[in-house]
Amino acid sequence: DLDPAANGFYLKQQIKSYGPLDVKQLDGEWDYCIVHQQAPTSKEVNNTDLAIGRFIHPAKKDKSFLWHNGIIKEGKFEGDWDTEWLFDQVLNEDLNEVDGTFACMLYHENQIYVFRNEISPLFKSDSTFSSTLFPGASTVTPNVYWKLDYNSEILEQGFNFKTKENPYYFGE
């Protein structure tokens, strides 16, 4: 939702669970809804972590949240969860050395940002984003940190970064 006092978005509700999304849990009074269903991509998942949903997106730091689609190469990140590690890289604007795949949405300081490297897909149409191509969608330009503008539904360009290693060749 938009919070005029905060000059941006505010998080109204967060649901973390395993399995399919139960849309009945959504109250229906929202402007944007970020949904990410995924398998945990941590180094090790134990029963306690599973029970508390530690590795369910979004990752949280203070009042900021990161949803990450992709996998950072094992041994290329510190900590237990690649998304937590990636979160630190994002907040430090240091994505050039991230070795792996990522397409992300970030809620930070009442704003929503989207970004991806060259390897992970991310598509958009107006205010809809998806890792799966859908009718009328265009590709989000890779290697750019984009800020979502709530009022105009356009993206404002932020900092640029490089894909560390792209195993694919795209001929011109």
Describe each region flagged by the PLM.
Residues 1-172:
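N-terminal segments that mediate ammonia production and transfer
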